[in-house]
Amino acid sequence: LIKEKDSIFDGVNVLLNSIPPKKNGDLVVKNFSNIIVKKKKTINWFGYFSSTSVYGDHSGNWVDEETELTPNSQRGILRKKSEAQHLKFFKDHKIPIHIFRLPGIYGPGRSVIDKIKEGKAVEIVKEGHFFSRVHVEDIATAIAKSINKSTPGEIFNICDDLPTESYKVLRYAAKLMNVKNFKSLNFDDPKISSKIKSFYHDN
């Protein structure tokens, strides 16, 4: 429990919610909405990190911010619900909500290069299954620009424009590093965990 909850947003004019939603909804909206409404005159910007999992499976076709959301994973369903809660918060109370849909995130210590260096690289081969990616610094840049030019109620996809099969990214990195030996599995291999496979529900 957070003590003195009423004063937690004193002096705050920018909020960024990166907490994954739970089955009963978004934790920030659920637990702090009344306080945020009280402080809305001083809150200039409110961002929410969602996920491209809200789109579901579009068979590898292009999607944008206007594409219908048809999530088929629990992760995507919860994100869609949380987005709706934030947008309702904006419509009902004029809280300056901005939603950012993120794909796979990479950066220092979190990339295929790091996995290759650590000997943990495993390529999962599934032809025609595309992933978009974004570097952590690009996320930070997008957030900074949004804060400087607020557009409440808007949704943004922050990702590259070159979606690719994950195994091709690994092979390219391995080629740059002159590494030839790493584990390779077909997607239907029983060794692949259900958690890993869940990331392949969306295409």
Model-derived features: where do they sit?
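A conserved pocket-lining segment of Rossmann-fold NAD(P)-dependent short-chain dehydrogenase/reductase
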Residues: 112-134, 138, 142
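Conserved Rossmann-fold NAD(P)-dependent oxidoreductase catalytic core, especially the SDR/UDP-sugar
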Residues: 33-74
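Rossmann-fold cofactor-recognition segment
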Residues: 1-3, 20
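Glycine/proline-rich active-site loop of Rossmann-fold NAD(P)-dependent oxidoreductases
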Residues: 80, 93-95, 105-118, 137, ...
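NAD(P)-cofactor binding segment of oxidoreductase domains
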Residues: 10-48
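Catalytic helix-loop patch of NAD(P)-dependent Rossmann-fold dehydrogenases
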Residues: 59-99
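Rossmann-like NAD(H)/NADP(H) cofactor-binding core
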Residues: 47, 98-101
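Mid/C-terminal beta-alpha module of Rossmann-like enzyme folds, strongest
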Residues: 140-142, 149-196
